[in-house]
Curated annotation (Swiss-Prot):
Assembly notes: Heterododecamer (2C3:3R2) of six catalytic PyrB chains organized as two trimers (C3), and six regulatory PyrI chains organized as three dimers (R2).
The protein's annotated pathway: Pyrimidine metabolism; UMP biosynthesis via de novo pathway; (S)-dihydroorotate from bicarbonate: step 2/3
Protein name: Aspartate carbamoyltransferase catalytic subunit
List of residues binding L-aspartate: K83, R166, R223
HAMAP family, per the entry: Asp_carb_tr
Binding site for carbamoyl phosphate: R55, T56, R105, H133, Q136, G264, P265
Key word Transferase present: yes
Gene coding for it: pyrB
Role played: Catalyzes the condensation of carbamoyl phosphate and aspartate to form carbamoyl aspartate and inorganic phosphate, the committed step in the de novo pyrimidine nucleotide biosynthesis pathway.
């Protein structure tokens, strides 16, 4: 098993499937009256979040606690970081405290890789800038496999703001490794073709959403990250929704078995309408639940829970 999880490129097909299989076992814990396992008792997991997050931080906290680990939540706001403490100084502090694993979210791309050089424990990337978010890709893959029974050969359309999406990058890497066929869809300014080619050469690019829907097993809608862009990327929110938003009419062009995903948070009415988000095809709530199971599996395997 790998020591850190920093990128979708860190896992080969065997490792990814081991994580997904372990997550399926962890999912059974959620149905128990007592939702706890003693696997990581005595271990310390630190959630080191330099960016605001609700879903991801709570998901990791729930995952660690269900494995009986001790959890320390660190928020940059109100901490020594606001007084100028560097990431390295924070890392050395965590090292001195004996952290067994550090889950880090940081606005700077590459920050988790630097952190991994400074601590002895395992580092899990919970999102770094516009770079990657590997556990989101794993939970997305788990959701696809749970709903559709396989990953190899699936046609997955990833739609929207690919340029600023760490989720898209990790999904391209992981899904390609697991044999899915990925097509990126969106306005030309939001599809970084050169970066995509470097990540996974077999990834397709299309600028017409309506053309890819009939052949898609999975449609993954991405949030338009307006906080990371100016108004030059597309004319208006209304025009974006008209060209690339998934509404009920477009959803009905999908194959009968196809599912709709979104990593959250959503801009309802922009990239996805409430009708679609709340439909039986939508896996959005499932993705949240599956995130806890997948992150339990990641922490369990990284910290040697299988050897305890």
């Amino acid at each position: 098993m790998i020591r850190h999880l920093l990128s979708g490129a860190d896992v080969d097909a065997g490792t990814a499937n081991r994580i997904l299989d372990t997550a399926a076992e962890m999912a059974t814990v959620a149905g128990r009256e007592v939702k706890k396992l003693p696997a990581l008792r005595g271990r310390t997991v630190v959630n080191l979040f330099y960016e605001d997050s609700t879903r991801t931080r709570i998901s990791f906290e729930a995952a660690a606690k269900r494995l009986s680990a001790d959890v320390i939540n660190f928020s940059a706001k109100g901490s020594s970081v606001t007084k100028g403490e560097s990431l390295k100084d924070t890392a050395l502090t965590l090292q001195a405290m004996g952290a067994d694993a550090v889950v880090v979210r940081h606005p700077a791309s590459g920050a988790p890789h630097r952190l991994a050089e400074w601590v002895d424990g395992s580092v899990v990337n919970a999102g770094d800038g516009t770079h990657e978010h590997p556990t989101q890709a794993l939970l997305d893959a788990y959701t696809m496999r749970s709903r559709l029974g396989r990953l190899a050969g699936l046609s997955v359309a990833v739609v929207g703001d690919v340029l600023h999406s760490r989720v898209a990058r990790s999904n391209v890497l992981l899904l390609s490794t697991l044999g899915a066929k990925v097509t990126l869809v969106g306005p030309p300014p939001l599809i970084p073709v050169d970066i995509v080619a470097a990540l996974a050469p077999g990834t397709a690019v299309c600028y017409d959403l309506d053309a890819v829907l009939p052949q898609s097993d999975v449609v993954m809608m991405l949030r338009v990250q307006r906080e990371r862009m100016n108004d030059s990327y597309f004319p208006s929110a209304r025009e974006y929704a008209r060209r690339y938003g998934l509404d009920g009419t477009r959803m009905r062009r999908l194959p009968e078995h196809a599912i709709v995903m979104h990593p959250g948070p959503m801009n309802r009415g922009m990239e996805i309408t409430p009708e679609v988000a709340d439909s039986p095809r939508s896996t959005i709530v499932e993705q949240v639940a599956n995130g806890v199971s997948v992150r339990m599996a990641v922490l369990y395997l990284l910290l040697g829970g299988n050897n305890r």
